[in-house]
A protein has these predicted regions:
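N-terminal targeting sequences that direct proteins away from the cytosol to non-cytosolic compartments
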Residues: 1-53, 165-188
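Short N-terminal helix-initiation segments at or just after the protein's N-terminus
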Residues: 12-22, 70-73, 89-99, 103-108
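Secretory pathway targeting signatures of secreted, lumenal, and periplasmic proteins
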Residues: 29-89
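Short, solvent-exposed coil/turn segments at beta-strand boundaries
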Residues: 42, 153-157
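Extracytoplasmic/secreted proteins, especially bacterial periplasmic and envelope-associated proteins
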Residues: 88, 92, 176-179
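Signature of long, low-cysteine stretches enriched in small and polar/charged residues
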Residues: 91-147
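Short, well-ordered beta-strand elements
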Residues: 157-166
Length: 188
């Protein structure tokens, strides 16, 4: 996504999780619980990335412009925060993410894909959307392509989340996110 979150940018009421877990990471993958994705080579681990409604979140990012990043992350959506079904949870995540401080100057979005799918044989929901911004601090950034997968991990207390945000129109970074998505798997 984009700049660091600000407290006043959200127009959607999103939960703030109190669940605190931290899955051990490796040099080649990002893991949250049982959801795993390969890291994108050359993108740096981003220990500052967070989304208020997601626990156990781990991310790698690449600077596009000063103040504008592309990234991928895996995390956990918790039933105690209202995340119990993949479709509704994917939609809530998109609403919360698009209206968060990461998209300062949010000016709209266009949904491209909204469909049921599977990840490693597990039921999942996929959304791909273009999120548009008009941000005077980063005038060259038009927005991001956002890819969200919410995965039923077979646990009643949590769902797996993959989220990728890559600079609109940036074929190289979009391609790297697509390659990472193809490595998504459920472990254990």
């Amino acid at each position: 996504p984009t700049p660091s979150p600000s407290d006043n940018a959200s127009s959607v009421q999103c939960p703030r999780t109190t669940v605190r877990t931290n899955t051990a990471q490796s040099n080649s993958t990002l893991r949250s619980g049982n959801l795993q994705v390969d890291r994108i080579s050359g993108w740096g681990y981003d220990s500052t990335f967070y989304l208020d409604w997601v626990s156990d979140i781990h991310s790698v990012a690449d600077t596009v412009y000063p103040g504008w990043m592309s990234d991928i992350a895996v995390g956990t959506l918790n039933a105690k925060d209202g995340f119990t079904e993949v479709r509704a949870s994917a939609h809530a995540t998109l609403e919360c993410h698009a209206s968060s401080g990461y998209y300062e100057g949010f000016s709209g979005r266009k949904d491209l894909v909204d469909q049921q799918t599977t990840v490693d044989g597990h039921p999942a929901w996929r959304i791909q959307s273009e999120v548009y911004v008009t941000n005077p601090n980063v005038p060259q950034a038009r927005g991001d392509r956002v890819d969200i997968y919410v995965v039923d991990l077979g646990r009643q207390d949590q769902l797996g989340l993959f989220i990728g945000s890559s600079n609109l129109g940036d074929a190289t970074r979009n391609g790297k996110v697509d390659e990472a998505i193809r490595t998504l798997k459920v472990t254990g």
